[in-house]
Amino acid sequence: MPLPFTLRQLEYFDAIAREGSLSAAAERCHVTATALALALDELERNLDLKLVVRRKGKGITLTAAGVTVLRQARQVLSGAEAFAAEAQQSATGLTGSFSIGCFPTLTPFFLPAAMERFAREHAELELEFLEAVTSELHEALLGGQIDVAILYGVDVSKQLEFEPIREYRPYVIVGEGHRLAGRGTIALADLGEDPLIQIDMRPSRQNTEYIFASLGLRPAIRHTTTNYELARSLVGRGLGYSLLVQRPAPSVTYDGQRVVNLELSDPLPPTVAGLARPRGAARTAKYAALREFLSAHTAV
């Protein structure tokens, strides 16, 4: 049974959705607006669906069916691109563009090695990266703006597949003058009413709240911040403690203060970081190579 569409028609439809007008999409695709309109008409006719609404002077908007078809079309196009890339692999390994998204608190621990060592090992790859919060990474993956995202295994969309690559044990940092700084290992309850400097980004905030709730504790939150290094600097100044997952190599904050890492004796589950991609998307050679590299070379 012949397919009711061509890849070219899907490419044109994707361009129309991105640009919001036939003329801009035609320029993007290097064809005439007439050719683009004919391709769209044929796609709608073959699918027996109304995909867009055309309003003179107001451009083009997608119908509800168009939104659904667009998401599926982008998955088909992504799979086709992956197929072409696999077929064209050079003897030296991987080629073409590869866009990686990453959650902000994970970025310093994953992306530098990827942008330097992984890129050097696969010199024909054109690496790009996007740093964004979880919801934006989900949208970028489903919209085809990035190929893969590095994020926590919390609140992952059901439209994505998540593959763990590293586990972390939560720990606490305190200033070097803190009364517990010399202990090495503590229970979270030992901090009592000490003020918490909380990382206020989803899912970091939710993970912190879950940890306290699972132990029957309620933190005394003093400050919240979306900036990982600001949290460390506030702790270094003796303004509270922070519950973290990643472990920077230096114990010195941006403003020259020292913080002390304290392990937690509480029976806490590990926090998982991994790779996400659209559900059903091809597991390309690029993806497999990145996964293998990050598993072996990621900073803790």
Regions found by a protein language model. Give the residues of each.
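A late-sequence structural motif
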Residues: F110, V259-V300
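Secondary-structure junction motif
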Residues: P195-L215, P250, R283-F293, V300
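Central regulatory/effector-binding core of bacterial HTH transcription factors
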Residues: T95-K158
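Interdomain hinge and pocket-entrance segments immediately C-terminal to HTH DNA-binding domains
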Residues: K58, A64, Q88-T107, E121-L125, ...
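Short helix-boundary/capping micro-motifs
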Residues: D14-T32
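A short LG(V/I)-centered, amphipathic sequence patch enriched
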Residues: E44-A64
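Hydrophobic hinge/microswitch elements
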Residues: V133-H138, L142-I146, L151-Y152, R202-V260
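Beta-alpha-beta core module
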Residues: K158-Y168, R183, D190, E229-R279
